Amino acid sequence: MKLLAVKVECSHELEDGLSFFMQDELDAQGIESRKRSDFVAEGQKHDSSLVELDDIENLPKDLELTAYFNYENADKKELVKKITDKIAEMKGYGLNTGEVSISTKEVADEDWNTAWQKYYHVIDFSRHLAIVPEWEDYHPAFSDQKLIRLDPGLAFGTGGHTTTQLVLLAMERALVKPMSVLDIGTGSGILAIAASKLGASHVLGTDISDEAVTAAKENIALNDVNNINVRKANLLKDIDDKYDLIVANILADILLELIPDLDSHLNKEGKVIFSGIDYLQLPKVEKALAENNFEIKMKMQEGRWIGLLIARKPD
Protein backbone atom coordinates (compact mmCIF):
# COMPACT_ATOMS: atom_id res chain seq x y z
CA MET A 1 0.00 0.00 0.00
CA LYS A 2 1.26 3.48 -0.87
CA LEU A 3 1.06 6.29 1.66
CA LEU A 4 0.90 10.06 1.36
CA ALA A 5 3.30 11.69 3.83
CA VAL A 6 2.36 15.22 4.90
CA LYS A 7 5.27 16.88 6.72
CA VAL A 8 4.60 19.92 8.91
CA GLU A 9 7.47 22.00 10.29
CA CYS A 10 6.37 24.29 13.10
CA SER A 11 6.80 25.15 16.79
CA HIS A 12 6.93 22.35 19.37
CA GLU A 13 3.95 24.00 21.08
CA LEU A 14 1.71 22.54 18.37
CA GLU A 15 2.89 18.93 18.75
CA ASP A 16 0.14 17.33 20.81
CA GLY A 17 -2.77 19.36 19.47
CA LEU A 18 -1.78 18.94 15.83
CA SER A 19 -1.03 15.24 16.31
CA PHE A 20 -4.47 14.69 17.82
CA PHE A 21 -6.11 16.64 14.99
CA MET A 22 -4.38 14.73 12.20
CA GLN A 23 -5.04 11.39 13.87
CA ASP A 24 -8.62 11.87 15.04
CA GLU A 25 -10.05 14.37 12.55
CA LEU A 26 -8.09 13.65 9.38
CA ASP A 27 -7.75 9.87 9.96
CA ALA A 28 -3.96 9.75 9.69
CA GLN A 29 -2.70 6.18 9.85
CA GLY A 30 0.44 7.18 11.72
CA ILE A 31 2.30 10.19 13.11
CA GLU A 32 6.08 10.59 13.26
CA SER A 33 7.46 13.35 15.50
CA ARG A 34 11.00 14.75 15.50
CA LYS A 35 11.99 17.58 17.84
CA ARG A 36 15.33 19.31 17.80
CA SER A 37 15.27 19.46 21.60
CA ASP A 38 15.14 15.65 21.78
CA PHE A 39 18.38 15.34 19.84
CA VAL A 40 20.04 18.08 21.89
CA ALA A 41 18.97 16.41 25.15
CA GLU A 42 20.19 13.02 23.96
CA GLY A 43 23.54 14.51 23.01
CA GLN A 44 23.91 16.18 26.41
CA LYS A 45 22.93 12.97 28.22
CA HIS A 46 25.79 11.13 26.57
CA ASP A 47 28.15 14.12 26.94
CA SER A 48 28.24 14.57 23.16
CA SER A 49 29.19 17.85 21.56
CA LEU A 50 26.50 19.74 19.70
CA VAL A 51 28.67 19.59 16.60
CA GLU A 52 27.53 15.99 16.23
CA LEU A 53 24.00 17.27 15.61
CA ASP A 54 25.19 18.44 12.21
CA ASP A 55 25.55 14.80 11.25
CA ILE A 56 21.86 14.05 11.84
CA GLU A 57 19.95 13.94 8.58
CA ASN A 58 17.52 16.86 8.08
CA LEU A 59 17.53 17.94 11.72
CA PRO A 60 14.38 20.05 12.27
CA LYS A 61 14.64 23.69 13.34
CA ASP A 62 12.15 22.97 16.12
CA LEU A 63 9.42 20.37 15.43
CA GLU A 64 8.78 18.18 12.42
CA LEU A 65 5.50 16.23 12.36
CA THR A 66 4.89 13.78 9.54
CA ALA A 67 1.41 12.29 9.14
CA TYR A 68 0.79 9.27 6.91
CA PHE A 69 -2.43 8.81 4.96
CA ASN A 70 -3.79 6.13 2.63
CA TYR A 71 -2.60 7.42 -0.75
CA GLU A 72 -5.64 6.19 -2.68
CA ASN A 73 -8.13 8.00 -0.42
CA ALA A 74 -6.12 11.13 0.37
CA ASP A 75 -6.97 14.53 -1.13
CA LYS A 76 -3.60 16.27 -0.95
CA LYS A 77 -4.86 19.84 -1.38
CA GLU A 78 -7.71 19.35 1.08
CA LEU A 79 -5.41 17.88 3.74
CA VAL A 80 -2.96 20.77 3.44
CA LYS A 81 -5.82 23.27 3.67
CA LYS A 82 -7.31 21.65 6.77
CA ILE A 83 -3.93 21.49 8.50
CA THR A 84 -3.24 25.12 7.59
CA ASP A 85 -6.63 26.16 8.98
CA LYS A 86 -6.03 24.18 12.18
CA ILE A 87 -2.66 25.85 12.73
CA ALA A 88 -4.33 29.26 12.29
CA GLU A 89 -6.97 28.22 14.85
CA MET A 90 -4.29 27.14 17.33
CA LYS A 91 -2.49 30.45 16.82
CA GLY A 92 -5.76 32.11 17.81
CA TYR A 93 -5.60 30.22 21.12
CA GLY A 94 -2.30 31.97 21.82
CA LEU A 95 0.09 29.19 20.81
CA ASN A 96 3.38 30.07 19.15
CA THR A 97 3.20 28.42 15.72
CA GLY A 98 6.78 29.23 14.76
CA GLU A 99 7.91 29.25 11.14
CA VAL A 100 5.42 26.93 9.41
CA SER A 101 5.98 24.91 6.26
CA ILE A 102 3.94 22.00 4.87
CA SER A 103 5.12 19.54 2.22
CA THR A 104 3.86 16.24 0.82
CA LYS A 105 5.38 13.18 -0.82
CA GLU A 106 4.47 9.63 -1.74
CA VAL A 107 6.13 6.84 0.27
CA ALA A 108 5.96 3.07 0.40
CA ASP A 109 4.22 1.68 3.49
CA GLU A 110 7.09 -0.62 4.36
CA ASP A 111 9.60 2.25 4.29
CA TRP A 112 7.78 4.08 7.09
CA ASN A 113 7.14 0.94 9.12
CA THR A 114 10.87 0.45 9.68
CA ALA A 115 12.27 3.99 9.49
CA TRP A 116 10.29 5.42 12.42
CA GLN A 117 11.50 2.78 14.87
CA LYS A 118 14.85 4.50 15.42
CA TYR A 119 13.05 7.41 17.12
CA TYR A 120 11.14 5.23 19.61
CA HIS A 121 12.83 3.98 22.79
CA VAL A 122 11.99 2.77 26.30
CA ILE A 123 10.05 5.23 28.46
CA ASP A 124 10.82 4.49 32.10
CA PHE A 125 7.66 6.23 33.27
CA SER A 126 7.54 5.40 36.98
CA ARG A 127 8.38 2.72 39.52
CA HIS A 128 5.08 1.09 38.48
CA LEU A 129 5.21 1.35 34.67
CA ALA A 130 7.69 1.31 31.79
CA ILE A 131 6.72 1.51 28.11
CA VAL A 132 8.91 -0.75 26.00
CA PRO A 133 9.01 -1.14 22.20
CA GLU A 134 8.56 -4.82 21.45
CA TRP A 135 11.89 -5.02 19.60
CA GLU A 136 13.93 -3.81 22.62
CA ASP A 137 15.25 -5.92 25.50
CA TYR A 138 14.54 -4.22 28.82
CA HIS A 139 14.60 -5.42 32.42
CA PRO A 140 12.37 -3.69 35.01
CA ALA A 141 14.09 -1.02 37.08
CA PHE A 142 11.98 -2.07 40.11
CA SER A 143 10.76 -5.48 41.20
CA ASP A 144 7.11 -4.42 40.91
CA GLN A 145 7.46 -2.38 37.71
CA LYS A 146 5.05 -3.50 34.98
CA LEU A 147 6.14 -3.42 31.33
CA ILE A 148 3.84 -2.25 28.56
CA ARG A 149 5.19 -3.70 25.33
CA LEU A 150 4.15 -1.82 22.21
CA ASP A 151 4.55 -1.90 18.47
CA PRO A 152 2.67 1.33 17.71
CA GLY A 153 2.54 0.48 14.00
CA LEU A 154 0.12 2.79 12.24
CA ALA A 155 -1.84 3.93 15.28
CA PHE A 156 -1.40 6.92 17.59
CA GLY A 157 -0.21 6.46 21.16
CA THR A 158 3.39 5.57 22.00
CA GLY A 159 3.49 6.89 25.55
CA GLY A 160 5.75 9.80 24.67
CA HIS A 161 3.00 12.40 24.49
CA THR A 162 2.45 14.59 27.53
CA THR A 163 -1.30 13.97 27.38
CA THR A 164 -0.81 10.20 27.54
CA GLN A 165 1.55 10.51 30.49
CA LEU A 166 -0.94 12.65 32.41
CA VAL A 167 -3.51 9.85 32.05
CA LEU A 168 -1.00 7.25 33.22
CA LEU A 169 -0.22 9.37 36.28
CA ALA A 170 -3.92 9.68 37.15
CA MET A 171 -4.51 5.97 36.55
CA GLU A 172 -1.76 5.05 39.00
CA ARG A 173 -3.67 7.00 41.66
CA ALA A 174 -7.21 5.99 40.68
CA LEU A 175 -6.75 2.24 40.21
CA VAL A 176 -6.41 1.34 43.88
CA LYS A 177 -8.56 -1.81 43.58
CA PRO A 178 -9.84 -4.05 40.77
CA MET A 179 -12.08 -1.83 38.62
CA SER A 180 -13.87 -2.07 35.29
CA VAL A 181 -12.33 0.42 32.85
CA LEU A 182 -13.53 1.97 29.58
CA ASP A 183 -10.79 3.51 27.41
CA ILE A 184 -12.39 5.79 24.81
CA GLY A 185 -10.19 6.46 21.77
CA THR A 186 -7.81 3.64 22.64
CA GLY A 187 -5.40 4.25 19.72
CA SER A 188 -2.49 1.85 20.12
CA GLY A 189 -4.15 0.39 23.23
CA ILE A 190 -1.51 1.77 25.59
CA LEU A 191 -3.96 3.04 28.22
CA ALA A 192 -6.08 -0.12 28.11
CA ILE A 193 -2.94 -2.23 28.62
CA ALA A 194 -1.76 0.06 31.43
CA ALA A 195 -5.13 -0.26 33.16
CA SER A 196 -4.90 -4.04 33.01
CA LYS A 197 -1.32 -4.05 34.31
CA LEU A 198 -2.32 -1.74 37.18
CA GLY A 199 -4.99 -4.17 38.35
CA ALA A 200 -8.21 -3.47 36.43
CA SER A 201 -10.70 -6.34 36.55
CA HIS A 202 -11.88 -5.80 32.98
CA VAL A 203 -11.07 -3.25 30.25
CA LEU A 204 -12.94 -2.25 27.10
CA GLY A 205 -11.02 -0.16 24.57
CA THR A 206 -12.90 1.59 21.78
CA ASP A 207 -11.85 3.63 18.77
CA ILE A 208 -13.54 5.05 15.70
CA SER A 209 -10.58 3.98 13.53
CA ASP A 210 -10.40 0.44 12.13
CA GLU A 211 -6.60 0.73 11.94
CA ALA A 212 -6.38 1.70 15.62
CA VAL A 213 -8.60 -1.22 16.66
CA THR A 214 -6.36 -3.62 14.73
CA ALA A 215 -3.16 -2.13 16.19
CA ALA A 216 -4.57 -2.17 19.73
CA LYS A 217 -5.43 -5.87 19.43
CA GLU A 218 -1.91 -6.60 18.18
CA ASN A 219 -0.34 -4.67 21.06
CA ILE A 220 -2.56 -6.42 23.60
CA ALA A 221 -1.30 -9.73 22.22
CA LEU A 222 2.28 -8.63 23.02
CA ASN A 223 1.41 -8.30 26.71
CA ASP A 224 0.54 -10.96 29.26
CA VAL A 225 -3.08 -9.81 29.71
CA ASN A 226 -6.37 -11.56 29.03
CA ASN A 227 -8.98 -9.14 30.36
CA ILE A 228 -9.09 -6.54 27.55
CA ASN A 229 -11.61 -6.35 24.73
CA VAL A 230 -11.34 -3.87 21.85
CA ARG A 231 -14.00 -2.84 19.37
CA LYS A 232 -14.96 -0.04 17.04
CA ALA A 233 -17.25 2.62 18.52
CA ASN A 234 -17.83 6.36 18.36
CA LEU A 235 -17.46 7.79 21.87
CA LEU A 236 -20.23 6.29 24.06
CA LYS A 237 -22.55 5.35 21.23
CA ASP A 238 -23.44 1.62 21.35
CA ILE A 239 -21.83 1.27 24.81
CA ASP A 240 -24.43 -0.27 27.12
CA ASP A 241 -22.51 -1.17 30.28
CA LYS A 242 -21.46 0.99 33.22
CA TYR A 243 -17.84 1.28 34.38
CA ASP A 244 -15.88 2.14 37.50
CA LEU A 245 -13.39 4.23 35.53
CA ILE A 246 -13.78 5.96 32.16
CA VAL A 247 -10.63 7.25 30.46
CA ALA A 248 -10.52 9.62 27.47
CA ASN A 249 -7.36 11.20 26.06
CA ILE A 250 -9.01 13.25 23.33
CA LEU A 251 -9.16 16.90 22.26
CA ALA A 252 -11.31 19.17 24.42
CA ASP A 253 -13.98 19.77 21.77
CA ILE A 254 -14.66 16.02 21.63
CA LEU A 255 -14.59 15.72 25.42
CA LEU A 256 -17.36 18.34 25.51
CA GLU A 257 -19.50 16.04 23.34
CA LEU A 258 -18.78 13.18 25.72
CA ILE A 259 -19.61 14.84 29.04
CA PRO A 260 -23.45 14.75 28.86
CA ASP A 261 -23.37 10.95 28.41
CA LEU A 262 -20.90 10.15 31.20
CA ASP A 263 -23.39 9.80 34.04
CA SER A 264 -25.38 7.00 32.40
CA HIS A 265 -22.19 4.97 31.78
CA LEU A 266 -20.56 5.38 35.20
CA ASN A 267 -21.05 3.20 38.26
CA LYS A 268 -22.11 4.76 41.57
CA GLU A 269 -18.62 5.49 42.90
CA GLY A 270 -17.11 5.76 39.42
CA LYS A 271 -14.43 8.19 38.29
CA VAL A 272 -13.36 9.74 34.99
CA ILE A 273 -9.92 10.70 33.68
CA PHE A 274 -9.67 13.33 30.94
CA SER A 275 -6.56 14.48 29.10
CA GLY A 276 -5.87 16.31 25.84
CA ILE A 277 -7.13 19.65 27.21
CA ASP A 278 -5.24 22.81 26.29
CA TYR A 279 -5.29 25.10 29.32
CA LEU A 280 -7.07 27.81 27.31
CA GLN A 281 -10.00 25.43 26.79
CA LEU A 282 -10.13 24.28 30.42
CA PRO A 283 -12.85 26.78 31.46
CA LYS A 284 -15.25 25.32 28.88
CA VAL A 285 -14.59 21.80 30.14
CA GLU A 286 -14.97 22.85 33.79
CA LYS A 287 -18.28 24.56 33.00
CA ALA A 288 -19.65 21.52 31.15
CA LEU A 289 -18.62 19.19 33.99
CA ALA A 290 -20.29 21.39 36.61
CA GLU A 291 -23.49 21.60 34.55
CA ASN A 292 -23.58 17.80 34.42
CA ASN A 293 -23.06 17.30 38.18
CA PHE A 294 -19.34 16.46 38.10
CA GLU A 295 -16.46 17.90 40.08
CA ILE A 296 -12.69 17.85 39.57
CA LYS A 297 -10.87 15.82 42.23
CA MET A 298 -7.35 16.30 40.87
CA LYS A 299 -5.88 18.60 38.24
CA MET A 300 -2.51 17.96 36.57
CA GLN A 301 -0.66 20.25 34.19
CA GLU A 302 2.43 19.79 32.05
CA GLY A 303 3.18 22.75 29.82
CA ARG A 304 -0.04 23.75 28.09
CA TRP A 305 -1.73 20.39 28.67
CA ILE A 306 -4.21 19.57 31.44
CA GLY A 307 -5.27 16.21 32.84
CA LEU A 308 -8.25 15.81 35.15
CA LEU A 309 -9.49 13.19 37.62
CA ILE A 310 -13.26 13.64 37.88
CA ALA A 311 -16.10 12.29 40.05
CA ARG A 312 -19.78 13.02 40.56
CA LYS A 313 -20.62 15.81 42.99
CA PRO A 314 -21.70 14.46 46.39
CA ASP A 315 -25.45 14.25 46.97
UniProtKB/Swiss-Prot annotation:
InterPro entries: Ribosomal_L11_MeTrfase_PrmA, Ribosomal_PrmA_MeTrfase, SAM-dependent_MTases_sf. One of its GO terms (molecular function) is protein-lysine N-methyltransferase activity. One of its GO terms (cellular component) is cytoplasm. Its EC number is 2.1.1.-. It is found in: Cytoplasm. Disulfide bonds: none annotated. S-adenosyl-L-methionine binds at residues 164, 185, 207, 249. Belongs to the methyltransferase superfamily. PrmA family. Methylates ribosomal protein L11. This is Ribosomal protein L11 methyltransferase. It comes from Lactobacillus gasseri (strain ATCC 33323 / DSM 20243 / BCRC 14619 / CIP 102991 / JCM 1131 / KCTC 3163 / NCIMB 11718 / NCTC 13722 / AM63).
